[in-house]
């Protein structure tokens, strides 16, 4: 774990974590509220001249289903097999019409259909509660469900396909000369 190993090496540097949607994270970074953010680029922040970034992780996507769903016994699914399902859509953004949303809508288009989106939110917990209540299914990044064991009425099936992943990137302002940030950036570059 990158954060843990950095903290162990530099225990006097406080790493604080905030969980927000991608729009708030990007705005916070550009406004100087954060030294660095870990995000998926749904805001197109990488087009900003004043930022640097590194790929941290490529996370596979999974399909969250309720236990009684006809597809819940499958070992893998592809996006085409989800046609006609009511989708509880986890948006990377609070605005619902972001660069990231456009990317995922394009994946549905390539699969041959427009998704039937029943609900849209950037809050994974709300979406999982609705899936467990059998209101629909959802596609989520695997990090949302990796630690869930014995989740009541939830089944997670890997989504297969060439583009069925999410890239997590570390982003920081190039003009931030803070010593702690520079040490962390070196750690990230060393992890490549």
Regions found by a protein language model. Give the residues of each.
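Hydrophobic residues within well-ordered alpha-helices
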Residues: 28-30, 82, 129-135, 170
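A late-sequence structural motif
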Residues: 155-192
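Secondary-structure junction motif
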Residues: 40, 85-111, 178-182
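A ligand-binding cleft/hinge motif common to bilobed small-molecule-binding domains
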Residues: 40-48, 102, 107-110, 124-154
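Flexible hinge/capping segments at coil-to-helix
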Residues: 50-61, 65-87, 182
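Ligand-binding cleft/hinge of the Venus flytrap
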Residues: 2-11, 33, 98-114
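Central regulatory/effector-binding core of bacterial HTH transcription factors
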Residues: 1-46, 121
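Short beta-strand->loop
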Residues: 51-62, 142-145, 150-164
